[in-house]
Amino acid sequence: MRGGTVQINWHEQQPVLTLDFHPVSRRLATGGSDHDIKIWVIASDDSDKKLPTATYHSSLSSHSSAVNVLRFSPSGENLASGADGGGIIIWKLHSTDDGEAWKVQKTLLFHHKDVLDLQWSQDGAFLVSASVDNSCIVWDAIKGSVQQKLEGHLHYVQGVAWDPLGQYIASLSSDRTCRIYANKPQGKSKNTDRMNFVCQHTLVKAEHQNHDESKPPVRAHLFHDETLPSFFRRLAWSPDGSFLVLPAGLCKYSSEVINTAYVMSRRDLSRPAIQLPGASKAIVAVRFCPVLFKLRGSQSDCFFKLPYRVIFAVATLNSLYVYDTESVAPILIHAGLHYAAITDIAWSSDAKYLAVSSRDCFCTIIEFENEELGLPYNLSGTKELDEGNTNCENMKPLKVDSMEIDAGSSKAKIKASSAAVEVTPSPPVLAQNNILMTKDVAEGNATSENDRPSAVDNMEVDVGENKAKMEVTPVAVQVTAPPVSTKNSASSKPTKKRITPIAIN
């Protein structure tokens, strides 16, 4: 693995707000505050020590304001982009004598204010968008018409995700709620059920155990409020639709506030099943690797009982975590990436590259070696998921040491012996920034507190009627210096936090 910040003029020294890889080729599309969409060709450098290269290919210049989000359709034939002011453009790929060109196919105008996020349906026939006007809109991408308007949020809708199995749409807002809409067709039109999404669950608060056992559990908000310093809360479904990961999570233990992401099991979307704490800054984006991987160990070693491994990236305002469902701890931590907030993340279709965009006008590209993440798994053999039957054993999380977490039951349970259980996650891969390293870190002589694991008090988790005490061993995160910048900015080194996923009420 290698990677770092690619120092080229991405968007005329303007913030890069979004990016996405083409599902077939290694084209990378980026959108920024300069009103343009740019297409880049990503390639590996022959030298082992150099970063991947990004070569400019073309520009798409029909927006008149900042481009906040862009996503390729599953087939790669179309590209949808949303901008300030509420405009959405659907671009279509055309073959030309010079190679290829993207031309405007549809312009979708219905949102009254900025579009912050959007997502294609799995068949590429529909599109859902999220806006500052507090609503989501389901579009017929072929006709360019409004299919349905989803209302209910009381503040900006900053993230939206369409279930790959087509049954759910999830939206996340700065009103501190996540709404899960289920498709309940109302009738038939030309022998085809007309989709109709109805709000099935609204996630607002959850019960957190009080450290003082004499006091009852406290109900607290699950998500950050509108003071979160980001316009984006990009949530995501796993490629198989088995679970949903929500960013912008907030968990309060006594006086300590912990940033977290929530994992939702498809079997029970009314409450989070697992939380991923540990980030020093708020989590703003989640993106799943489109490739599923074969198990490296036995199935009983996995955190989720799935016949394959799912890998996903979680971006905070200043760092990147990569998780594997076969591992409790992150398999990769990349900190100190940028001088300003991270805005979006994207995987290439072959899992070769992971890209990150930032408001500091630059993008980071991480390249993985062949089979570094594992051997690809063919999902076509999983009949239950293909048919949408998710009430199977594959959806039940497995034991983590002496803990058994059942995310699908009405109440998550933790079974443990009366003695404390020591959970020691394997160390994650520590990413190195190839642009510049401080001398102490480069020589392995770092002496700052941030470079040493600190003692962590025993953490009590009370879920349902059973109690489990865990002594969690923190993982040291080595932080290397980012590229030298002439801009004044505060250090983005994250402090050490607990990063072991735990079950919650």
UniProtKB/Swiss-Prot annotation:
Residue ranges of the TM segments:
none
Q: What is its main location?
A: nucleus
Q: Single Gene Ontology BP term?
A: trichome differentiation
Specify the domain of life of the species encoding this protein.
Eukaryota
- What exactly does this protein do? Component of the chromatin assembly factor complex (CAF-1) involved in chromatin assembly following DNA replication and DNA repair. Required for several aspects of development, including apical meristem maintenance by regulating the durations of the S- and G2-phases of the cell cycle through its chromatin assembly activity.
Organism name = Oryza sativa subsp. japonica (Rice)
| Compartments reported by the entry | Nucleus
- SMART domains per the record? WD40
Q: What is the protein name given in its UniProt record?
A: Chromatin assembly factor 1 subunit FAS2 homolog
Q: Which GO terms describe its cellular component?
A: CAF-1 complex; nucleus
Name of the gene: FAS2
What is known about its subunit structure? Component of the chromatin assembly factor 1 (CAF-1) complex, composed of FSM (FAS1), FAS2 and MSI1.
Positions of region (Disordered): 479-505
